[in-house]
Amino acid sequence: MFTDTINKCAANAARIARLSANNPLGFWVSSAMAGAYVGLGIILIFTLGNLLDPSVRPLVMGATFGIALTLVIIAGSELFTGHTMFLTFGVKAGSISHGQMWAILPQTWLGNLVGSVFVAMLYSWGGGSLLPVDTSIVHSVALAKTTAPAMVLFFKGALCNWLVCLAIWMALRTEGAAKFIAIWWCLLAFIASGYEHSIANMTLFALSWFGNHSEAYTLAGIGHNLLWVTLGNTLSGAVFMGLGYWYATPKANRPVADKFNQTETAAG
């Protein structure tokens, strides 16, 4: 039932590992692109959200954030939160090693950070209408995120990436417009519910940092948020999705390392 999708994920993990090993610059550029694409979505939804009544703000922001993951998937790029799922399948299927997984994940995260900050810088240099006004929701939301309790951030991070990886998983299992509908629904649920995505937060934090933020907004607070949200994102991508669907697949139908590697070799 899930074998074909797991094979796609494991094959993508092998592709990611090859790109990282054979073309490190290309891997970092592609990772930066993912951070930038998510950042463009963040700028969009906060621009709209800043104009709206709080009662409808979560719905509208959630309904328009689908552009972020659509760009990542359709244009192609390396997103940390998706990699937590892909690389887990790769390890279980034998297409990559544990060592490769733990070497690639931090590189992807840092590449995403570069792209996220770059987009925020461009927005700031371009006038950044959200940034000079201290009452902008960019500043209030960023501050609230950096002062939230660790366990709140951790579990909101877990719920968030469960939805993000479900969007990616369903996009792999569908064709045509169904891909976009799957992405749209999952990201609507993530944003409207107020969950935490480490890469999306990177651009938000950079935007507030470049603007007229409160003195209570600190680098330590940003680090606090990104640490716990990243851990929560990793839990759901690797365990809820990667291990979850691996063990939901009957053992006889799971990819076997030798067979998978033979398929990869035959495919070039």
Curated annotation (Swiss-Prot):
Source superkingdom: Bacteria
Keywords for the protein's UniProt record, in alphabetical order: Cell inner membrane, Cell membrane, Membrane, Nitrate assimilation, Transmembrane, Transmembrane helix, Transport
Places the protein is found: Cell inner membrane
The UniProt record lists the keyword GTP-binding: no
Entry membrane topology: Multi-pass membrane protein
Presence of the UniProt keyword Membrane in the record: yes
Residues spanning the membrane: 26-46, 60-80, 113-133, 152-172, 180-200, 226-246
Cytoplasmic topological domain: 1-25, 81-112, 173-179, 247-268
Periplasmic side of membrane: 47-59, 134-151, 201-225
A biological process term (GO) from this entry: nitrate assimilation
Alphabetized GO MF terms: formate transmembrane transporter activity; nitrite transmembrane transporter activity
Database matches in Gene3D superfamilies: Glycerol uptake facilitator protein (1.20.1080.10)
Role, per record: Catalyzes nitrite uptake and nitrite export across the cytoplasmic membrane. Is up to 10-fold more active than NarK or NarU in nitrite uptake for subsequent reduction in the cytoplasm by the NirB/NirD nitrite reductase.
Family: Belongs to the FNT transporter (TC 1.A.16) family.
PANTHER family from the UniProt entry: FORMATE TRANSPORTER-RELATED, NITRITE TRANSPORTER NIRC
Protein name, UniProt field: Nitrite transporter NirC
UniProt organism field: Escherichia coli (strain K12)
Lineage, top ranks: Bacteria, Pseudomonadati, Pseudomonadota, Gammaproteobacteria, Enterobacterales
